[in-house]
Every structure is written in C-alpha cells, then in structure tokens.
UniProtKB/Swiss-Prot annotation:
It comes from Acidithiobacillus ferridurans. Belongs to the Rho family. Keywords: ATP-binding, Helicase, Hydrolase, Nucleotide-binding, RNA-binding, Transcription, Transcription regulation, Transcription termination. This is Transcription termination factor Rho. Facilitates transcription termination by a mechanism that involves Rho binding to the nascent RNA, activation of Rho's RNA-dependent ATPase activity, and release of the mRNA from the DNA template. SMART domains: Rho_N (SM00959). InterPro entries: Rho-like_N, Rho_N_sf. Homohexamer. The homohexamer assembles into an open ring structure. Transmembrane segments: none annotated. One of its GO terms (biological process) is DNA-templated transcription termination. It comes from the Bacteria.
Length: 58
C-alpha cells in the first residue's frame, strides 16, 4: 500500500481500510486526513519505505 494507491481510492474504500485496521473516528474526516491516519498507523506497526530520485546540488 503506497500513497499513490491511497489517493486513488474513494472515501468508501478508505473507510473499509480504516475499519480493517481498527481505526476509529475517521467517518467525519477529510480524505487527506484519513490517508494520513492510515499511513500513521502503518508507521507504528511496520516500516514505511520510500522510493525516488535524490538530487544533490553542490
């Protein structure tokens, strides 16, 4: 599960993910806040990996 996949999901899909993860109080939150809560919960129990290009300017 990565950020791009979460952004593509509907609010209903995100609510199901929250329910599966045991997160409560997300029914009245904005989509971005729900995504943050999902990623925050994942960070607490797993590692979060990022990928991309790092440009070093000198």
């Amino acid at each position: 599960m990565n950020l791009t996949d979460l952004k593509r999901k509907t609010a209903a899909d995100l609510a199901v993910i929250c329910q599966d993860m045991g997160l409560e109080g997300t029914a009245r939150q904005k989509k971005q806040e729900i995504i943050f809560n999902i990623l925050n919960a994942r960070a607490q129990c797993d590692a979060i990996y990022g990928e991309g290009v790092l440009e070093i300017l000198q």
